[in-house]
């Protein structure tokens, strides 16, 4: 197993890409701290992992709640919280340190797209801009900063930020989202440069369109789905498993010489 006994925090693990990464990390032997703003989503992810490990590794099923928004399972912990709240972000990291004494891997996946309505910069409501930045940029900063403090003490660590192809090639009329993911790309490079001497690797994954609950409203419209497929040379929509495979590689020792890299997983969308 490629992540055996590695301690990993995955934010936004209650659905979509985060759920796919959490599931794959568990199968690769990682011990997990999963976080999400939605407890119901975390419980669904827990059930999926419990079932998978029971089938593949003989782990007992079942996840029991405790106090303070933390849920416990034989293979890891769950923290209900919002990455845009500093105390919550720090509590996510502390859950790993408290239980296992270290944190090897952070996947900064929690994020939002903003309004479903196409908006240019001058028509974007200020509160929408601020909320997108608060989650997509400040949330990544808060979790990474808290994790790095522990990684500096232990002398190693790896961070995988989930950015977007939109951080490299902007989507039309999505100014807030594009800017937020561009910031994640730049922040990833800055962290990689600053902390390489401390043996902390930092990379980002830039997904194209991936089929999740967040994108379903668009992909459920047949004309839009086909338009996206036609714009993708590989000829299909991305899946959470595609991103999970990339995350496993970047988090594993196989990527020991990889830092400051933006791994685009988009079926060729940005080259067309």
Model-derived regions, located:
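Active-site helix of classical SDR
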Residues: 144, 180, 188
């Amino acid at each position: 197993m490629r992540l055996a006994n590695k301690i990993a925090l995955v934010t936004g693990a209650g659905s979509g890409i985060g759920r796919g990464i959490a599931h794959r990390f568990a199968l690769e032997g990682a011990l997990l701290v999963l976080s999400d703003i939605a407890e119901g989503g975390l419980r669904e992810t827990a059930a999926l992992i419990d079932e998978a490990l029971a089938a593949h590794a003989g782990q007992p099923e079942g996840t029991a709640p405790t106090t303070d928004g933390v849920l416990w399972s034989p293979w890891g912990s769950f923290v209900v919280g919002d990455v845009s709240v500093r105390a919550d972000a720090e509590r996510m990291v502390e859950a790993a340190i408290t239980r296992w004494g270290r944190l090897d891997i952070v996947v900064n996946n929690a994020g939002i797209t903003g309004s479903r309505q196409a908006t240019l910069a001058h028509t974007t409501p200020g509160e929408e801009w601020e909320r997108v930045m608060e989650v997509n940029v400040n949330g990544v900063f808060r979790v990474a900063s808290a994790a790095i403090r522990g990684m500096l003490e232990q002398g190693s660590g790896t961070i995988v930020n989930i950015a977007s192809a939109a951080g490299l090639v902007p989507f039309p009329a999505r100014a807030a989202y594009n800017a937020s993911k561009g910031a994640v790309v730049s922040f990833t490079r800055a962290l990689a440069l600053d902390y390489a001497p401390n043996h902390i690797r930092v990379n980002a994954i830039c997904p194209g369109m991936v089929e999740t609950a967040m994108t379903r409203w668009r992909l459920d419209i047949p004309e839009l789905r086909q338009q996206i497929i036609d714009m993708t040379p590989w000829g299909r929509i991305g899946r959470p498993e595609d991103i999970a495979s990339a995350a496993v590689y970047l988090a594993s020792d196989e990527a020991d010489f990889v830092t400051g890299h933006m791994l685009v997983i988009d079926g060729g969308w940005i080259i067309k």
